[in-house]
Amino acid sequence: MFAAEPRRAVLDHGRALRGNPRLINVLLVIDNFDSFTFNLVQYFGQLGVEQRVFRNNEITPAEALALNPDRVLISPGPCSPAEAGVSLGMIEAFAGNKPIFGVCLGHQSIGHFFGGHVVRADRLMHGKTSPILHHNSDLFKGLPQGFKATRYHSLLVERATFPAALEITAETAEGEVMGLRHRTLPIWGVQFHPESIATEHGMNILKNFLSLN
């Protein structure tokens, strides 16, 4: 029995999958106290993913490793990476071991962990959409250029000090970093919210993550 238990019951979607959860992706979700986390959980559930959800103060990296998830999601949140509980510790624990996906604060946490600077954005974005320009690879494979994505953030990973270990995979027309990946490890992040109803092709981004290793 682990010291930490999931905040929500394990989400088991699909009667045919019951009894053999290893047939599907098991996703560990680190919830940074954000309402958008539920939307992400719902979307991944629609894709048939079993999930274990913990708030960022409910589980340690060692306990998370013992759960042996297939993938890790670091959720959005209202704070900075330094204030995001165990989020940075989860990146350290799982980097190179399991695929990691960071959304908004999770994306910023990846940038921060690998040496980037997370700074105040020139523009406060609260429920606004921007066209996204991307490299048509990994998370963005098969997506049209300039698809609209919803943004809720006042911080972003600074382009001028972007860490060498990471690569920019998406941006706005103004050059703001909207997507990143590690150059050699299975780690990806997006600054915008793929789970927002106003984001185009959000479900496809999540599907693409599930196909990456």
Language-model regions, residue ranges each:
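Intrinsic-disorder-associated, low-complexity terminal segments enriched in Asp/Asn/His/Tyr and depleted
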Residues: 12-13, 20
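Short, Lys/Arg-enriched N-terminal segments with co-localized hydrophobic residues
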Residues: 18-25
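Cysteine-nucleophile active-site neighborhood
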Residues: 25, 69-142, 206-207
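Structural signature of beta-strand start/N-cap positions in the alpha/beta core
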Residues: 26, 50, 70, 99-101, ...
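A generic "structured core" feature
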Residues: 28, 35, 47, 53-55, ...
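Catalytic beta-strand/loop cores that center a nucleophilic Ser/Cys/Thr
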Residues: 138-184
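Acyltransferase
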Residues: 196-213
